[in-house]
Amino acid sequence: MVGDKAQSLSSEKVLYTEIGHATPIAVAMVAAFPPPISGQSLAADLLAKGLESDGDFVVFKFDIAQPIAGDPLLKRLFRLCRVASSLAWCCATHRHLVVYLQLGHGTKALCRDLVLMAIAAAPRHPCVAHVHGSGLRKALDNMPKALRQLETIALKQLYRAIVLSDNLRVMFCDILPEDRIVAIDNGIDPNFIKLCNDAHRPIRDNIRILFLSNFIAEKGIFTLLDAAKMAQEAGKNYEFVFVGASAKTIDAPENAVESYMRTHGIENVEIYPIATGEEKHAHYRDADIFILPSQYEGQPLCIIEALFEGLPVITTRVGGIPDIFGSSTCVRYVDVGSASQIVGAIDSLASKQIRDELAHVARDIAWSRFTPEKHVEAVKAILRGAYFS
């Protein structure tokens, strides 16, 4: 199967070369762009920059990002109408165009995407859908029957569906044939990679465990707080560092994390706001272990960033995460919601010698699969194939 897919993509590149088109490939990129910062928006930004830097492509951006806290319904509908009308105009005024659509994960997002796929289908432009998560099938199954049938019909018209790993192909089972479902690994911002190096972490008495994600229950943050409390009560010299969206910007009770810490007397946790650039890099460099005990995931960029930084990872076997590591030794898996297993996993990585040995394993995984060049080139091949289909 892998060989067949490689041969297919190779054929698409040959076709592109033989035609020798005089104008760039036009791509209508309908996706969530920063802000706000999320795995989806960072992935879209990376791809857009990669396409824009290539003279063979011209990109028209249509931003479907929503604030984490959400907006009133009327404001959301107005934004959708504006994007839909702009996309319709773009599709109508370009004879040859590929629509790249970043599919949503929820029922409301899929209703939005149904409208956008219909706009692309009207002038028969090929559509490539990219799913940066693992919840699409659940959201589809939760839709009312009539809407689910319409959504399924629209998805069946896709030229290709891109998922993040082989484990996530199941989202399109019974909708698309296997050869129209493509697994492409995420890529990391090249500016972040430039800051990474192979330096060993300093010798110190305590162990710093980094959580870098949104402060929401689905990311396992309250389970991690319970683990921090257990470590504190056991007298373990573990320091937990939380970096992410503050409570007032997410759909959760205000100051939920800080309130939880006060209520339970947790004193071994440091909290920092969202970090970017060198500031984010510094958090990784100052950590000994990275942790993300999520309830569900696609292929988290923060885990891949941690691998580039040479950090061992504690996480859950959800979504596409197991495909990141395979049989690697640089990961410790815990069950969703198990604070005691988190403490045990940290205990297993308490030796600095072990962590230093695993750093090489982590970096090998990152550099072999998750560079921005590998990601962008793989998506380009799909877009070329769609353009000349």
Q: Which residues are covered by each model-predicted region?
A:
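Short, structured helix-loop element that forms part of the nucleotide-activated donor/catalytic region
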Residues: 239-267, 278-279
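Conserved donor-binding/catalytic core segment of Leloir-type glycosyltransferases
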Residues: 28, 200-229, 240-243
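Short hydrophobic beta-strand element within catalytic cores of glycosyltransferases
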Residues: 312-315
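Short alpha-helical donor nucleotide-sugar binding micro-motif in glycosyltransferases
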Residues: 274, 282-287
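Aromatic "clamp/platform" in nucleotide-sugar-dependent glycosyltransferases that forms part
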Residues: 295
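Donor nucleotide-sugar binding/catalytic pocket of nucleotide-sugar-dependent glycosyltransferases
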Residues: 150-195, 204
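Conserved acidic donor-binding segment of nucleotide-sugar-dependent glycosyltransferases
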Residues: 327, 331-339, 348-353
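A short, well-ordered alpha-helix in the C-terminal region of glycosyltransferases
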Residues: 354-369
